[in-house]
Amino acid sequence: MKPIVVFAMFLVATGCMTPSQPGTTGTLTPTIQAEVGREFEIAVGQEAKLQGSNVVIRFRGVTNDSRCPSDVQCVWAGNAVAGFDLSGAGQSEALINTTLDPKSVSYGGYTIALVGLKPTPKSGSAIPALEYIATLRVN
């Protein structure tokens, strides 16, 4: 009888360790290293440290996404707004657009530009907040 109780406790314990968000592993790559002049991708909640400086960019998430779905023909491309926390030269928050201005921000002597945002919307389905990946370039 005792082995059954131990096995049941094992199942309960491992069941409590599953990720709360479907499709995620519960872990993100640690802070990535970004190079000036090169594009890099950053996931929601992830940080990128700019090589050769103290500047750190953290992708907070997308606050608004009205981009045209890939399976629809639109008269306007739409716009998405991505939020970032910036640190290393004082604390700052930045909202950067995909289509409208500002498409970049100045911080710590650098220009941080949003050059892409994935995934592309599809009609009839919302993008889960944690699935966004921003492509940035710092000059």
Predicted regions located by residue number:
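Positively charged n-region of N-terminal signal peptides that target proteins for export
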Residues: M1-I4
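C-terminal motif of bacterial Sec signal peptides marking the signal peptidase cleavage site
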Residues: V12-G15
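Bacterial signal peptide processing site
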Residues: M17-S20
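N-terminal secretory signal peptides
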Residues: L28-Q73
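Envelope-exposed proteins and targeting segments
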Residues: R38, V44-Q46, S53-V55, G78-A82, ...
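Mature extracytoplasmic domains of secretory-pathway proteins
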Residues: V56-T98
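Short Fe-S-cluster ligation motifs
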Residues: T98-P121
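Short, exposed beta-strand-loop hairpins at the edges of beta-sheets
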Residues: L117-L130, T135-V138
